[in-house]
Amino acid sequence: MLKPLLAISALSLLSLPACAQDTQTKPAPASAAQSLPFSPVIVSGDTIFLSGHLGRLPGSRDYPDGGIGEETRQTLENIGATLATVGASHSDLVRCQVFLADIADFAEMNTAYRKFFPANPPARTTVAVSGLAANASIEIECTGRVGHGDQ
């Protein structure tokens, strides 16, 4: 009984390198804090996992002027730039989670968000939280599927 179990375990271990080859990690952009322990995007098989993105201006720690609408727009622009590093776009997203520092920003956030997803938007959850990293007003995390936008 022990020999078959050991044989199955050994075969399972041999298949691990094949699984690892399906996962692609992209380094954080130069503007991101390099010391943080996460990847901005991981592709595993045909699934794209995006870490939470903020609306900082590229190459800066600053947020755009203009309130939550502009910060939402910049956040989604940053997501688009990250998606492009793995050959994807907003149309490949299937689910997003939006975190707002103030739920009163919900309507204005939706106005900006809608411009990026005029048809067939991804499934979405929006929640208000007591605080976000780097004093952001919004953070968006998404999951996508490679080639989803081609369908």
Model-derived features: where do they sit?
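N-terminal presequence-like segments and the immediate start of the first folded domain
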Residues: 2-77, 81-94, 100-151
